[in-house]
């Protein structure tokens, strides 16, 4: 009987130690391209941003890139959190080249179409205001409900850096 109790206790102890094993979270398929970004929007007219820097006078604001619900490596979401044009659109992406685009993508925030071209993420591609290297993002956008095209600009250029956590970079 003593051996049976000892065996039961040993089995219970072994099971309790096994249940303490923590399983880390898995990475999403677009983890290298996903993030929080501080961007500025410039107008582009004839390939130049001259005189069209920070076109709307907003300075830098936050956008997000993240995986879709399907969590496949060839698509991700670009979302401005309502900070600028109120858009959330699914784009096609190439995680190896870190590029992305969409033509007439459905805006999930309200009924409109969004075209994003020449989207790219460059690892350590820029310096933040604090002097730290950070990933750089750049893409061009045309909204189908933008009344200022083509009178004032051809498209909008979003560019900026990945969130670093440093106060001086916010």
In which residue ranges do the predicted regions lie?
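Sec-dependent signal peptide recognition
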Residues: 2-10
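Bacterial signal peptide processing site
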Residues: 21-23
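First exposed extracellular module after export/assembly in secreted or surface-exposed proteins
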Residues: 27-170
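C-terminal motif of bacterial Sec signal peptides marking the signal peptidase cleavage site
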Residues: 15-19
């Amino acid at each position: 009987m003593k051996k049976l109790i000892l065996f039961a206790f040993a089995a219970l102890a072994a099971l309790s130690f096994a249940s303490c094993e923590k399983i880390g979270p898995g990475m999403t398929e677009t983890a290298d391209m996903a993030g929080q970004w501080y961007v500025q929007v410039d107008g582009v007219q004839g390939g130049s941003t001259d005189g069209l820097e920070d076109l709307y006078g907003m300075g830098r604001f936050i956008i997000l890139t993240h995986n879709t619900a399907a969590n496949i490596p060839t698509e991700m979401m670009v979302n401005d959190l309502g900070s600028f044009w109120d858009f959330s659109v699914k784009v096609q992406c190439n995680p190896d080249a870190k590029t992305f685009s969409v033509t007439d993508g459905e805006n999930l925030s309200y009924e409109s179409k969004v075209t994003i071209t020449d989207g790219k993420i460059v690892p350590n591609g820029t310096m933040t205001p604090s002097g730290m290297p950070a990933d750089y993002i750049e893409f061009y956008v045309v909204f189908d409900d933008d009344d200022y095209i083509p009178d004032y600009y051809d498209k909008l250029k979003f560019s900026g850096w990945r969130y670093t956590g440093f106060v001086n970079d916010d």
